């Protein structure tokens, strides 16, 4: 005679993490701020006034920048990881791939569409041309209209 099987017990409902609204531009939300873990690159929330934060995922301790420090972001050119750094720094080393990235202020860069594939390109202000990383087309920028665009045969 078959024995009736009882259903698996339902696991207890996990405690719900507090829901956070999107933090304002300054990175604080009701007495909390956020930073990126120096070990695993996860976003960490911490109380205002803390001097360091221990990541619950990788246990790395990340120092909290002093109050009033403006932060900026860039994408690593080596591994495409989002990096946060103190505004005004000239270079930022990626903690994942160790690539040293040039950090330019917003007023030091300009944008132009590639003359071949129309990809939006960013270049250092004052440059005469910019090479597209997608199609290798070189687009002339600046005041000179006598220069022509060309393709590199790489």
From Swiss-Prot:
GO molecular function: DNA binding
Top-rank lineage group of the source organism: Eukaryota
InterPro entries reported for this sequence: LSD1-like, Znf_LSD1
Region Putative zinc finger 1, residue ranges: 34-64
Function: Positive regulator of reactive oxygen-induced cell death. May be involved in the repression of the copper/zinc superoxide dismutase CSD1 and CSD2 that detoxify accumulating superoxide before the reactive oxygen species (ROS) can trigger a cell death cascade. LSD1 and LOL1 have antagonistic effects on CSD1 and CSD2 accumulation to regulate oxidative stress-induced cell death.
Name recorded for this polypeptide: Protein LOL1
Location of region: Putative zinc finger 3: 111-141
One GO term describing the cellular component: nucleus
Keyword set includes Nucleus: yes
Pfam families xref list: zf-LSD1
Family matches, as PANTHER family: PROTEIN LOL1 (PTHR31747:SF1), PROTEIN LSD1 (PTHR31747)
Keywords from the UniProt entry: Apoptosis, Hypersensitive response, Nucleus, Plant defense
Miscellaneous note of the record: Over-expression of LOL1 induces cell death.
